[in-house]
Amino acid sequence: MKLELIHGRPDSVDGRLKKEIRTYDLLDELGIPYERIDHKAAETMEACAEIDEALAPAAICKNLFLCNRQKTQFFLLMIRGDKQFKTKDVSKQIDSPRLSFAPEEYMEKYLDITPGSVSVLGLMNDTENHIQLLVDEDVLHSEYVGCHPCINTSSLRLKSADVFGKFLEHVHHGYQVVKIDTAEK
């Protein structure tokens, strides 16, 4: 079954979560165009291959929700899907103690997102700026970025300039660029 790329929001909100609709509402309010694919839940990068193909040429990102050992600093790391996260390398670049994956309860508390749905668009729910956004430099070089609208049964293709410009400005978040090497084969 070929996935269909649709311009804009769904025609109906039936069966869709409020957080997904809030995402479309905000993108529309900001005048950010997007294309959408609806699909079965995509919880791993491996399950995303067909989605990635349909969203091409977007940089499909792994979005990792991280924290320090004390759980006092939280980070959302956007890296290309073909790269591996090495905590030592990223921790050194941001001058932070060793990072690890943050517990699910903080993901829900700060981003209103569940595992498998982590997305830069979840920053719209982080109104008190608990989360620091880290972006792999290669993601910034892509014309488009692919991400979830706060739910993993849809994926969006947005212009990178809109995400890292209009969207982040509106939600009062900046970002720090990190360099992550391509995984060795």
Give each language-model segment a name.
Residues 1-185:
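Extended, low-hydrophobicity, polar/charged segments
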